[in-house]
């Protein structure tokens, strides 16, 4: 007798219906896993991510919630455009094929998705809404256009994100990346910087690590801006510093290579230096070049040299700093390299420190009117002096910068803007949305095909009627993923205020910690921006955030150091060949330490795959792949199936209220496991859930079918219901086997009997002539005669009952048999 998982799983996948009721009065629960990019094939990371979310969704349905559990596709992006370029295929066709393949794969896992709410971000019906958002952002002052520095790939002729620049070269072309100034569109995320920072504290169910990462990314710092007069130029240099108290220790100023002042410097040596410096990273050796310019110290009669330095970033503050080498590590290294003065102005106990920078608290000295003050007081005093002189002020600075959303790519959402020579920047009228991508594009040359399109690019100006040109940049793909969770709330992929307010925020959001900053921060910003524009009233998109760990596997190499797939390694080992067994690492295509989920599902079934990725390891921790572990899960499923089927009949209308003795103990254990397992599900301790229902399975198997059939029936009914969120196909099949009514996923969650959870048992010592011979567990305050009988029976193999002279019993503590 064998469990036919293939037919069972296919049958129930076709039978389930998880649509959401529009008119339900139930309390809502919104469960969402981060939607995937349609690469065409799911991997084990996907499987683990989606299995975690599905357990929560199924459990919440069983607890009586109206569950929204949708799925969609983050469909725009570079891979589709690159595939089009490399294979001469339309990105839309390539993307749709991949979506179709992945949809089939996801359905084979048995995920309880609301498939009727499926969306794809590359559909005009989806992105027409974000084009309208953009127009509203313009109206509310949340979007603007300006010239800014970008990473430019001269071969692909496009802007690259910082993450796409590897060792100063384009990740795809290998060309040396240039810095260019281009007009770009931005969203004013900085308008919400303080609110984004402050409200992190309200996210009680977010991992602290994620909140810390966002806090650092926003990077609030308090200090001062100071205007330095540049000798020989009718200009001032504005800097921001968090350490204005160290101003008397300043020995130089430095600007970044992209600072506006640098653009006026024509010296060949300086231009060559800047060109070489741009390819180097911030963590390289601290280098710089003297500009030939000096600035006036605000309080001292001395000049400070102005340098261009590679550790000064335009992205922070004003792109300029004053250097105090005695109290900053970077400044110290720079000063040593270029022989600049090192002037200490803070010390612990009036002791000068010259050999290394001092970063601690202390007393000011060498600082005129600041001498003798502690640092905090010195900051206040010097800021007041700067304000009195009109050359500085107290300033709060954020590391966070406005979000540049322009991409010189075809496969993205068109930005709904028209450029007219007479009227300037003109928004596309709302009635003309969506601006749809043309399909007749060519990818034969580098750059953005939209920029060279013979017809799509040209359009009449909505204001004056003259010929104008469309904006050919497209939105950053993070734009689409920053609001998709709101689109799922409505059936037509739009933003409906009532349904958004009903279902949002997302109650459980599941995804990798690699999205801790950009995606999650942009989504938080979008909710604030859309709230400001009147779309809904939800500021925070995600109540509980679960960042699942990675799926890891041992790595293998052959004798020549070539990476091997696990199955290749097994074949070589079987042939006696030598291979190198490496460390356990995250599954990756490059190192070939991957396992195809489709192979596991085909060989063992979806429930085995689901059970394995949920067993042993807490969701937030990395898990190690184990073939033996998969086999063990498969054996458990078959064992449970046989155990239920071999009972032949199970009475789902059991009554065990009056059972006593050992059977009562079994029933208590079952209900305690149910209670603990339910608490584990509430707190997403899914590995503990698995451990408890495995224990429950073994417990039920111990019960004597002759004396405890009714209790077995109760245990089986509970067990089948509690495994359903994790192994839904098996559970549905067993529910039908025992004569269950309707579909199991629609049945309520079993409730543990509170009276059985009270631990009213005590351990009593059994003595013979005062010496301990056994211990027994009995109910608290058991009548003495019953206690004596149980105690006597427990040592019946040690005494001749006919020789018992008397029995002394102390309730709840000890029984002494005197012979």
UniProtKB/Swiss-Prot annotation:
Annotated source species: Wolbachia pipientis subsp. Culex pipiens (strain wPip)
Gene Ontology CC, one term: cytosol
- Write the protein's name: Leucine--tRNA ligase
Provide the binding site for ATP.
589
PANTHER family, sorted: LEUCINE--TRNA LIGASE, MITOCHONDRIAL, LEUCYL-TRNA SYNTHETASE
Sorted alphabetically, the keyword list is: Aminoacyl-tRNA synthetase, ATP-binding, Cytoplasm, Ligase, Nucleotide-binding, Protein biosynthesis
Membership in a protein family: Belongs to the class-I aminoacyl-tRNA synthetase family.
Asked if the keyword Protease belongs to this entry, the reply reads no
Primary gene name: leuS
* Enzyme Commission code: 6.1.1.4
Please name the InterPro entries in this protein's record.
aa-tRNA-synth_I_CS, aa-tRNA-synth_Ia, Leu-tRNA-ligase, Leu_tRNA-synth_edit, M/V/L/I-tRNA-synth_anticd-bd, Methionyl/Leucyl_tRNA_Synth, Rossmann-like_a/b/a_fold, tRNAsynth_Ia_anticodon-bd
| Locations listed in the record | Cytoplasm
**Where is the motif named 'KMSKS' region mapped on this chain?**
586-590
The reply on keyword Chaperone is no
Catalyses: tRNA(Leu) + L-leucine + ATP = L-leucyl-tRNA(Leu) + AMP + diphosphate
An annotated Gene Ontology molecular function: leucine-tRNA ligase activity
For the biological process aspect of GO, one term held by this record is: leucyl-tRNA aminoacylation
> 'HIGH' region: where is this motif?
36-46
Q: Per the annotation, which location comes first and is thus the protein's main one?
A: cytoplasm
